Structure formats: structure tokens, C-alpha cells
UniProtKB/Swiss-Prot annotation:
This is Eukaryotic translation initiation factor 3 subunit D-1. mRNA cap-binding component of the eukaryotic translation initiation factor 3 (eIF-3) complex, which is involved in protein synthesis of a specialized repertoire of mRNAs and, together with other initiation factors, stimulates binding of mRNA and methionyl-tRNAi to the 40S ribosome. The eIF-3 complex specifically targets and initiates translation of a subset of mRNAs involved in cell proliferation. In the eIF-3 complex, eif3d specifically recognizes and binds the 7-methylguanosine cap of a subset of mRNAs. The keyword Hydrolase does not apply. Residues 98-166 are annotated as: Disordered. Belongs to the eIF-3 subunit D family. GO terms for biological process: cap-dependent translational initiation; formation of cytoplasmic translation initiation complex; regulation of translational initiation; translational initiation. Signal peptide: none annotated.
């Protein structure tokens, strides 16, 4: 009997394996199923272990980077774990922090740990860790987790930026009527407004002392404290405007109020103006006992003063100091004394009575009217600070103001004592950047008053830390209209903004309204407020209507 033998069961079979051939490179062409979807982080055995892997890095398929296949070992070191105390739940606030000088700012600007494949430490970028060995302290400073360096710059840690406070708290019973943003206001224009016509002139002016034109840094002069009363009277408390409102005009204001509205697009801080509409007449007022009359300092600066009331360099304390300097400077540069000649207007100062024996600041008031079209006649009180005697004998009226230097290092400015005599243009350009709104207001007030000259004084602290003693370092004068062109101030646009607000109020019913600049946005809002708003503040003072215009300030005895 024959027997069949199965050789296949006795001997192992040989199957030909499939060999992958990569024609375009080296290595396998396909990824085995075992290793699919497994994240991979490039690494080196010399790297310290920080985390398992990082798959958040986006792939870069752009072929224009020649070094995209460069080694990216060490890219995960920025995510390494450092055993330290947890500081994520709190932050320290140093009120006495000294700001870095300008040359130290932005020193880590080009050392960002970008994940886009283009920055340092990223794939295709410059690998700084492969080139430089950093100490633990330096690595910590560049680590975004620690709230210093880049982390603080990009806002990952630290307190949020402080929001500015509104000049007045908006109440629940106020109705918002209109919002006007700055881009729309900048486009307004009201051309061909003629010069104002004088209606009434009041007050007495003293003549300017030309010796102050020879002051320079090497021949500085101390700023004196002048014991004189300065009246800051609002529109409805002005007895002359009350008298004129019965026969002339239908819109009434002061030059300070008009300048605030006309230069509103340059303002950053919040302000408010109360408007009353009675029939076809509109009265623009400032609220009593507010900071409306204080001069801002570095309002338009890239780095405004820090909001710390305990510091002499806080915005409010600097405003008080600037107002103190401005009023004392405007009186010191005049020829004072009983024997010195004075320029007297037709009427006496309307804010003092004949029986009062007080020293009043040199000021001349012009009550002028302007035709704004559409039967709108504006009547406003404007001011001169001094008068200059020309060789021909004709008087030239002056608006005298003062710029003040408080701390050039903190203000990111230029040293006046080094640049004022040789590069006065650079000093003025820096002031135009930091105080654009204040200088524009002064220019508008000089134009409205019809001043022939705008005199600017440069006043600085004797010591940057002492805000009570100052010196005059120099003076400079301009023609108001030429200076307006120099600072890019368009009077057509200023009149257009004013006319826009007047038209909005004229369309409303009789009552009380308030326009306010938003403290944090470039917006002006118009509110309809109850008629008794702010009346409670006036009644507490116990002053009658006849004494309302006697609001005065004595800047010689102010404690700053």
C-alpha cells in the first residue's frame, strides 16, 4: 500500500518579504499602524526633561524657508517645569517704582518664543538655547510663566490697566441722547466765521516787563508767589452776561468752556459741561467746585502720570501745580506797583465791588459776539492777561501762559536745562506731543479774545522731587493764528464742533443737559438730566444768586 507524504507539513515555508523602496529619499515610505497618531516631539539626549511632549506647535508647510528642516532640539525648554512657590494668585504693587530710562525699554522685543515657525526657538527660527547657556535666573526672566519680562509685557500677569474715572457719575435718571465719536467730529467744518465783535470791555491790565525776554537757562529767575485773587466765574453767574442775555445773542458761554468743546478731539481725560436751554437761548456752564479750571499735565503723553494720590506726580497734584505756576507766572512778568501805568477798559472789573479792598489779578474781559449762521449768535466772555507797549504807542494785548517741567525722566521728555537754549524747537515739539490738548485750548482762547501775542513761559522745578519751588528758564512768543497753523489746529473744525453741539441742543426741549467726554473712549455723550441736578450742591454753600459770581482762588497760598 502506497503512502503519500506531505512535505509541506514537515518543512517550514519561506515567504518573500515586501521591501519598500524610497525613490525620493531614505527611510520607510509608509508608517506602520502601530505608530500612527502617536505625538512626537523632537528631542536630544542632552536636553533636560521638562515635559513629555508638545503637539501644540503648528506645522509649517511653507517651502520658502530654507532652514525649515533645521534641528529644533531644545524647543520645549520654555515649557520646562521649575519647582518654585506658586505666585499666580497674587501680585505685588510697588508705588515707589522708578520707571526705566528710555534706552532700556524694548530690550527683549526680538526675543519672543514664537510658535509660528518664524521666531526664535521655533522651528525654522534662531535657536538661542543651542548657542548660549543661560543661567537659571535669566531663563526665569524670559519665561512667560513668571510674570516678568515678556509675560508682563504681553499682559499674562499683573494687574489690568487702570481705567480713568469719569468727571461726574452718570445717574440712573439721566437719558442718553447722542453719542459723538471723535472721527466724526474731526470731519466737521464751519468756514468763514468772522472775527468777533466787542460788546463790552471790562477790567484793568498791567504792562508786560520785557526783561523777562532775556531770561535763559544760565540766567534763570525764581518764580514768585503773587498774592492776588483770580476769579473763575461760570456763565450764568456773570452779571454782564445776565445783562446782555436780555438783548443780544442766544448762545452764551466763556472762552474756557468754548475752548474745551472746540478742542475736545484732542482730550483724553474726562470733562463735563452743563447746558441749560430756556426758550431759544442756550447757556453753557461749568459745575462749581470741580477740576474744570485745573490745567492738565502730560494728558496726551504716551506714558501719562501714574494715578497715585500720595505722590506729588499724580495727575491731580500735577494739575494743581501747573495751575499754581500758570497764574503766578502770568502776574510776575507784568510791571506791578502803584506808580506803574495800567491799561483800563471802559468798565471796571465786574466781579468786585467798589468797597472791596483786595488785590485782583491783572485781567481784561472782552464780551464778544459771533454770527454762526442760522440765526445763531454766540456771546462769550474772553480774557487778556497783559498788554505790551509797542514803539508806535499802540497797545498789543497778550495771553500769557506757562509750561512746566516736573520730572523729565518720569515724563519721558527732554532736559530743559540742556536743550532749551540750543534746541528750543525740540522742547516745544515734545510739549506739543505731551500737552496737545492744553496748548490747543490756550491757542483757541487767544484767538477768541483777539490777542496779538501768545506768550509762553518755561518753568521748571528747582529739584525734581520738590514741587513747591520753581524757576523761570525762558519765554517764547507767538502770534495766535500762526501758532494754530503750526500745531495743526483748524479753527474751521473747531467752529464746526461747537456748531454741531449747539444744533443738537437747539433741537431738544427746554431743560438741562450735560455733555461729557468718556474717560476711556474717544466719545462725547449728550445727556438729558433733571432740572434739579447739581442744585443740592449749590444750596449747601448758603450763597444766594447775587453772590454766585464771587468764586475766587488765591493761588499764592495754595498748598501744593
Amino acid at each position: 500500500m502506497s503512502e503519500t507524504i506531505n512535505t509541506a507539513a514537515q518543512f517550514p515555508s519561506f515567504e518573500k518579504p515586501t521591501v519598500q523602496f524610497n525613490e525620493k529619499g531614505w527611510g520607510p515610505c509608509e508608517l506602520p499602524d502601530t505608530f500612527k497618531d502617536v505625538p512626537y516631539q523632537p528631542f536630544s539626549k542632552n536636553d533636560r526633561l521638562g515635559k513629555i511632549c508638545d503637539w501644540t506647535n503648528t506645522s509649517n508647510n511653507d517651502k520658502k524657508y530654507q532652514n525649515k528642516y533645521a534641528s529644533s532640539f531644545g524647543t520645549g525648554i520654555q515649557y520646562s517645569y521649575y519647582h518654585e512657590e506658586d505666585e499666580t494668585t497674587f501680585h505685588l504693587v510697588d508705588t515707589a517704582r522708578v520707571q526705566k530710562p528710555p534706552h532700556q525699554r524694548g530690550r527683549f522685543r526680538n526675543m519672543r518664543n514664537s510658535r509660528s515657525g518664524r521666531g526664535r526657538n521655533a522651528r525654522g527660527g534662531l535657536n538661542t538655547h543651542g548657542m548660549t547657556t543661560l543661567s537659571g535666573k535669566n531663563v526665569k526672566a524670559r519665561d512667560p510663566r513668571h510674570g516678568r519680562g515678556m509675560g508682563k509685557k504681553f499682559g499674562h500677569r499683573g494687574p489690568p490697566p487702570k481705567m480713568r474715572e469719569s468727571s461726574v457719575a452718570v445717574r440712573a435718571d439721566w437719558a442718553s441722547i447722542e453719542e459723538m465719536d471723535f472721527p466724526r467730529l474731526i470731519k466737521l467744518s464751519l468756514p468763514n466765521i468772522k472775527e468777533g465783535v466787542d460788546i463790552v470791555t471790562c477790567g484793568t491790565l498791567e504792562y508786560y516787563d520785557k526783561t523777562y525776554d532775556r531770561i535763559n537757562v544760565k540766567n534763570e529767575k525764581p518764580l514768585q508767589k503773587i498774592d492776588r485773587i483770580v476769579h473763575t466765574v461760570t456763565t450764568t453767574d456773570d452779571p454782564v452776561i445776565r445783562r446782555l442775555s436780555k438783548t443780544v445773542g442766544n448762545v452764551f458761554a466763556t472762552d474756557a468752556i468754548l475752548a474745551t468743546i472746540m478742542c475736545s478731539t484732542r482730550s483724553n481725560y474726562s470733562w463735563d459741561i452743563v447746558i441749560e436751554k430756556v426758550g431759544d437761548k442756550v447757556f453753557m456752564d461749568k459745575r462749581d467746585h470741580t477740576e474744570f479750571d485745573l490745567l492738565t499735565v502730560n494728558e496726551s503723553s504716551v506714558e501719562p502720570p501714574t494715578d497715585d494720590d500720595s505722590s506729588c506726580n499724580s495727575p491731580r497734584n500735577l494739575a494743581i501745580e501747573a495751575t499754581f505756576i500758570n497764574h503766578n507766572f502770568s502776574q510776575q512778568v507784568l510791571k506791578t506797583g502803584d506808580q506803574e501805568p495800567k491799561y483800563k477798559f471802559e468798565e471796571s472789573n465786574p466781579f468786585i465791588s467798589e468797597d472791596e479792598d483786595i488785590q485782583v489779578a491783572s485781567v481784561g474781559y472782552r464780551y464778544k459776539k459771533w454770527e454762526l449762521g442760522s440765526d445763531i449768535v454766540l456771546v462769550a466772555r474772553c480774557e487778556h492777561d497783559g498788554v505790551l507797549q509797542t514803539p508806535s504807542g499802540e497797545p498789543q494785548f497778550m495771553t500769557i501762559k506757562a509750561l512746566n517741567e516736573w520730572d523729565s525722566k518720569l515724563a519721558n521728555g527732554v532736559e530743559w536745562r540742556q536743550k532749551l537754549d540750543t534746541q528750543r524747537g525740540a522742547v516745544l515739539a515734545n510739549e506739543l506731543r505731551n500737552n496737545a490738548c492744553k496748548l490747543a485750548k490756550w491757542t483757541v482762547q487767544a484767538v477768541l479774545a483777539g490777542s496779538d501775542q501768545l506768550k509762553l513761559g518755561y518753568v521748571s522745578r528747582i529739584n525734581p522731587r520738590d514741587h513747591s519751588r520753581h524757576v523761570i528758564l525762558g519765554t517764547q512768543q507767538f502770534k495766535p493764528h500762526e501758532f494754530a497753523t503750526q500745531i495743526n489746529l483748524s479753527m474751521d473744525n473747531a467752529w464746526g464742533i461747537l456748531r454741531c453741539i449747539i444744533d443738537l441742543v437747539m433741537k431738544q426741549k427746554d431743560g438741562k443737559y450735560l455733555i461729557m467726554k468718556d474717560p476711556n473712549k474717544p466719545i462725547i455723550r449728550l445727556y438729558d438730566i433733571p432740572d434739579n441736578t447739581f442744585d443740592s450742591d449749590d444750596s449747601d454753600d448758603g450763597e444766594g444768586d447775587d453772590e454766585g459770581f464771587q468764586q475766587v482762588y488765591n493761588y499764592a497760598h495754595n498748598k501744593i
